[in-house]
């Protein structure tokens, strides 16, 4: 596929940040083929290298499906918002975590019980580590940050905290003060630097983000 002269665009659906996906995409770019992928792990780990190869060979890497489900956020930043001096990007970037937090709050069920339900319904993987530890959301926010601020991808420098330590008492305390708990990915332009982080946040109940529940992103 990577060397076939009849192929102009390669769609990568293998997944994973290394192994065959990385080798195939790298080889295809070096052979002047455009790439379409939803593989945020691959881009978060190897994106800087792959983007450099793509530019050298005058081809593109397109990854709209890698971030925020059906929300066309990559296109919006690339074509419009990027030129408006973005100072901050934040949002709910992992539907599994949002589903678990929503049900814990609404039904008073503990984390492990809701996680098992999410796995049965297909909202969580058999091995949910990337989701519940915040790694999936970190892949996404580092890509968004790179787009929004035109900086290199900095996955390894992003603070990451998941939802696996959230307890029911946390929701009770948050509710008493008018807050909800959401796992957010946040990228922010500081005076002389950029900050990227993923962690559970207290969100005002009347905010738009607080109203996004279940498996939805925002």
Tell me the role of every PLM-derived stretch:
Residues 55-129, 135-136, 143:
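Rossmann-like NAD(P)H-binding beta-loop-alpha module
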Residues 16-31, 38-79:
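Rossmann-fold NAD(P)-binding glycine/threonine-rich loop
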Residues 215-218:
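Long, structured protein-protein interaction/assembly regions in large complexes
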Residues 1-18:
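A structured beta-alpha segment of the ubiquitous adenosine-cofactor-binding alpha/beta core
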Residues 113-211:
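Substrate-binding/catalytic subdomain of NAD(P)-dependent oxidoreductase enzymes
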Residues 21, 43, 47, 70, ...:
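Generic structural signal for well-ordered, non-membrane alpha-helical segments
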